[in-house]
C-alpha cells in the first residue's frame, strides 16, 4: 500500500548515490549476460558457432555500449572546485524518463542474449524494442498530431456578449 501524502523529494546526494548503484547494477547485468553468452556459445559450442553468433555478440555489445554510455552521461554529477556536490545528475530511477527506456533496452538485450544460447532465432524477440519505440512515437507524437483539428478554431462566445444578444432578442419580441 502506498504511503499517504506527498511523495518526499530526494536530495542531490541521494540521487547521486542511487545513480551510482543503478549504473553498477546494470553493468553487472551486462557483464553477466556477456559472460554466459561467450561461455556457452563461443567456448562450449565453439565448433558450431557461426558468423551470426559473432554478429549477435557485436550487436549486443553495441546496444549495451550505447545504452550504458547514455545512462552514464545522464547521471554525470557536477562537483565544485572544493569537491562539494553541485549537481547529482539526472535521476536514473525516475518513472517515465528516458533512462527507464534505456534500462528496458539493456534488460531486453540481456534476456535475449542469454536465451539465444539455445537458438539464434531468439534474436527476433529483439524486434520488440523498435516496436515499442514506434508505439511510443505514435501515441505521444504522431497520433495526436494527425488527429488534431486542422481547421480554424471556433470563435468563443463571451458570456457578456451572449447575454447582450439575448436581451436584444427579448426587446424585439
Curated annotation (Swiss-Prot):
<keyword id="KW-0072">Autophagy</keyword>
<feature type="transmembrane region" description="Helical">
    <location>
        <begin position="105"/>
        <end position="129"/>
    </location>
</feature>
<dbReference type="GO" id="GO:0043231">
    <property type="term" value="C:intracellular membrane-bounded organelle"/>
</dbReference>
<feature type="compositionally biased region" description="Basic residues">
    <location>
        <begin position="160"/>
        <end position="173"/>
    </location>
</feature>
<comment type="function">
    <text>May function as a negative regulator of endoplasmic reticulum-stress induced autophagy.</text>
</comment>
<feature type="transmembrane region" description="Helical">
    <location>
        <begin position="25"/>
        <end position="45"/>
    </location>
</feature>
<dbReference type="GO" id="GO:0005789">
    <property type="term" value="C:endoplasmic reticulum membrane"/>
</dbReference>
<protein>
    <recommendedName>
        <fullName>Transmembrane protein 208</fullName>
    </recommendedName>
</protein>
<feature type="region of interest" description="Disordered">
    <location>
        <begin position="153"/>
        <end position="173"/>
    </location>
</feature>
<keyword id="KW-0256">Endoplasmic reticulum</keyword>
<keyword id="KW-0007">Acetylation</keyword>
<dbReference type="GO" id="GO:0005773">
    <property type="term" value="C:vacuole"/>
</dbReference>
<keyword id="KW-0812">Transmembrane</keyword>
<feature type="transmembrane region" description="Helical">
    <location>
        <begin position="51"/>
        <end position="68"/>
    </location>
</feature>
<dbReference type="GO" id="GO:0006914">
    <property type="term" value="P:autophagy"/>
</dbReference>
<keyword id="KW-1133">Transmembrane helix</keyword>
<dbReference type="InterPro" id="IPR008506">
    <property type="entry name" value="SND2/TMEM208"/>
</dbReference>
<keyword id="KW-0472">Membrane</keyword>
<dbReference type="Pfam" id="PF05620">
    <property type="entry name" value="TMEM208_SND2"/>
</dbReference>
<comment type="similarity">
    <text>Belongs to the TMEM208 family.</text>
</comment>
<feature type="modified residue" description="N-acetylmethionine">
    <location>
        <position position="1"/>
    </location>
</feature>
<dbReference type="GO" id="GO:0006624">
    <property type="term" value="P:vacuolar protein processing"/>
</dbReference>
Amino acid at each position: 500500500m502506498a504511503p499517504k501524502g506527498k511523495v518526499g523529494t530526494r536530495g542531490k546526494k541521494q540521487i547521486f548515490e542511487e545513480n551510482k548503484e543503478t549504473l553498477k547494477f546494470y553493468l553487472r547485468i551486462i557483464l553477466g549476460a556477456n559472460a554466459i553468452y561467450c561461455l556457452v556459445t563461443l567456448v562450449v559450442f565453439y565448433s558450431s558457432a557461426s558468423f551470426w553468433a559473432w554478429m549477435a555478440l557485436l550487436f549486443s555489445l553495441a546496444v549495451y555500449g550505447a545504452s550504458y554510455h547514455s545512462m552514464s552521461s545522464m547521471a554525470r554529477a557536477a562537483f565544485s572546485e572544493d569537491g562539494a556536490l553541485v549537481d547529482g545528475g539526472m535521476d536514473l530511477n525516475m518513472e517515465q524518463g528516458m533512462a527507464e527506456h534505456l534500462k528496458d533496452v539493456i534488460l531486453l538485450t540481456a534476456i535475449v542474449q542469454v536465451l539465444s544460447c539455445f537458438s539464434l532465432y531468439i534474436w527476433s524477440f529483439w524486434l520488440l524494442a523498435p516496436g515499442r519505440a514506434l508505439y511510443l512515437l505514435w501515441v505521444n507524437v504522431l497520433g495526436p498530431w494527425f488527429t488534431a483539428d486542422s481547421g480554424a478554431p471556433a470563435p468563443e462566445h463571451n458570456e457578456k456578449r451572449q447575454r447582450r444578444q439575448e436581451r436584444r432578442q427579448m426587446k424585439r419580441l
